[in-house]
Amino acid sequence: MYPKILTLIVVSILLTNSRSVMSQNQPNFPDYGNPIRLEVAKKIILKAEAEAKKNGWKMVISIVDSGGNLVYLERIDGTQFGSIDISQGKAKCAVNFRRPTKAMEDSVVAGGMGLRLIGLPGVYPLEGGELILLDGKIIGAIGVSGGTSAQDGQVARAGLEGLKD
């Protein structure tokens, strides 16, 4: 008797969860555009580096194009070597999934279904990866590593100010 009731409860829960997952609407993500140009990447890096240095943070800043290929990388003297791969990973993650890495971090922190992101290849669920948009299209992304997640995000967003120059 109890195994049948338990089976019924489990099946009901699974059906309820699958319906709610399937009914979720896919967000509107920006389309990919032409790859970022080197001179634009350099302007973004300069703004990001200035923000990091202003705060005394040692960081690595990476720019990738709309295909996730490295365009430019800056490592502030004394930054840990591990941040090189992490900054590139954050930038690639932002481009590949067409969203800031903070969105991934928030999903993982919320738990539940968001935890499955941890097992996906190329996901860096840490703040510090931001899309670089031009005319509403993704031309690349910036990835920053070396500080706390919030510091990495602050420097990445400061770098985006380089688009305005």
Could you tell me what each predicted segment is?
Residues 1-7:
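Bacterial N-terminal signal peptides that target proteins for export
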Residues 7-15:
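Hydrophobic helical h-region of N-terminal Sec-dependent signal peptides
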Residues 22-165:
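Flexible, solvent-exposed loop/hinge segments and secondary-structure transition points
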